[in-house]
């Protein structure tokens, strides 16, 4: 697995096997840094500075992100196809050998998924972005893979979707939970999981949620089914499908609806709003009354803030058509 430059290297043995702490792993996430705007913490920004829009060019793409110091979420990593980039100290660096990197809320930790097996196991790199240290944690054994990492809101755990190859496609068979403090991973098989399921955290970090045959299912961390909401459409929304308050969650509306995006009540699954927006992707929530969506704009695309009627209120990023075709993905997290 590629290294992250500058980390101390230590090795320790646990009950679950050997966890290798590699200073070089966390430093690979900081190598080849390209200049970009440095972000000031919103809490310390003067009122005038907080309103200034800063344009940030994303390394290796034609994407321009438009940020303000007081924004509630910011782009902390992104991928272009299977190439991942991480933001450190306001700069983005290409991370060779990793297909995705996701930063935890508050920015202390990141989890990176490599592009290849190591010793017949899939794994993740847990990076402590404050201490500049990293630890390799095995997730599943070949032929399974674990990808699509999502952090719990407290930054204590990451969940990944576990898949098995079936012909030319990959079928979901369960999920893996990575404990950031213990530096361990536990894989859980989910009986009857939807083949296209992608597991995300519920807002409390005690259950995971995924789509199931056009609806939504919630599972305990033991893989047991807790509840099902039929006919909601599949959960969607970048790193977190749930609103900041945890009251609502986003789904792609069923095909029988005119509107593409639905807002559902977390407790009941009932419809809270239909959002009439031509979303090509949903990147999460801005606040409880606004979401982030990628929409067509001329011959290109834009990431926008939109209210729950579908009205765009701000442009967050300009995305060329070539980058969208190359599957660029912007990861917005809460600092």
Task: Locate predicted features.
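Secretory targeting and sorting signals
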Residues: 1-48
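Sequence signature of WD/YWTD-type beta-propeller architectures
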Residues: 2-7, 45-335
